[in-house]
């Protein structure tokens, strides 16, 4: 049998077929590229070179290439996972507790409305850490929690500010996927506590916003309730429509309905 570049390409693609890998062929250079779908990292294989080796080593030449490419791509994937940073993400308590049956996510209770999950971030995307991924990473749950809290403190924060009826509202919205996660940055909360005169109210209506409010009057509570409900309804990953009083390092949910009262004949009408 005469081996050609075309036949070799077909042979390699069949032997290297994996759902997480994809192939790209440069017909001008006769180069087959095998790369990871998610990271786009990969290996280039010169088909004429493999064909030349096949003329001498036959089947062993193909086996050598398959082994080399497989090991290299698996090593890249492992390196990608290990080099990824771990961050905490805030989710609603109604969020699933398992990636699939028998494979629970790594979680920590947070408030009556929220729960902390942990994400392995590889710059372009992130994956929530479940027990199977935890084993692959070779980490303990405690190590994951410590790394996540350390990394969330490294995230920058710059608030936009708005004042309404004597109340001040601070908004954080960087869209990096971890805006709500900054609620776990204790030093951030303490620095905000020092500049707040009234009640400190915190809200994480969805993944991409953190609201901190300096509430001075009842109108302020109405505004934060309406605001949180609006953000919750609009969020891509909604968390909770409730806001929280923050005091002494604790979050207490505010069970308050947004009111839009009108006065009729001197009486309040709901």
Curated annotation (Swiss-Prot):
NCBIfam families tied to this protein: PRK13668.1
Record-given protein name: UPF0354 protein Bcer98_3354
Stated family: Belongs to the UPF0354 family.
Domain of life of the organism encoding this protein: Bacteria
HAMAP family: UPF0354
């Amino acid at each position: 049998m005469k081996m050609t570049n075309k036949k070799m390409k077909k042979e390699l693609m069949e032997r290297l077929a994996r759902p997480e890998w994809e192939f790209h062929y440069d017909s001008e250079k006769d180069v087959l590229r095998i790369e990871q779908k998610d990271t786009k990292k990969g290996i280039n294989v010169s088909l004429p070179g493999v064909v030349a080796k096949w003329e001498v080593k036959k089947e062993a030449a193909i086996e050598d290439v398959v082994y080399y490419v497989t090991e290299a791509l698996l090593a890249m994937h492992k390196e990608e996972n290990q080099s990824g940073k771990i961050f905490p993400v805030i989710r609603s308590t109604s969020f699933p507790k398992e990636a699939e049956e028998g494979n629970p996510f790594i979680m920590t209770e947070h408030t009556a409305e929220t729960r902390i999950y942990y994400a392995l971030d590889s710059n372009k995307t992130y994956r929530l850490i479940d027990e199977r991924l935890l084993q692959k990473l070779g980490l303990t749950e405690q190590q994951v929690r410590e790394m996540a809290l350390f990394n969330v403190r490294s995230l920058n924060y710059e608030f936009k500010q708005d004042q309404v009826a004597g109340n001040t509202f601070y908004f954080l919205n960087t869209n990096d996927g971890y805006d709500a996660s900054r609620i776990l940055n204790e030093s951030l909360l303490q620095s905000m506590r020092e500049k707040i005169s009234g009640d400190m109210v915190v809200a994480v209506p969805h993944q991409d916003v953190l609201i901190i409010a300096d509430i001075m009057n009842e109108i302020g509570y109405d505004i934060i309730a309406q605001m949180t409900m609006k953000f919750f309804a609009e969020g891509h990953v909604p968390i909770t429509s409730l806001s929280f009083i923050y005091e002494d390092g604790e979050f207490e949910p505010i069970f308050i309905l947004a009111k839009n009262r009108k006065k009729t004949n001197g009486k309040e009408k709901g």
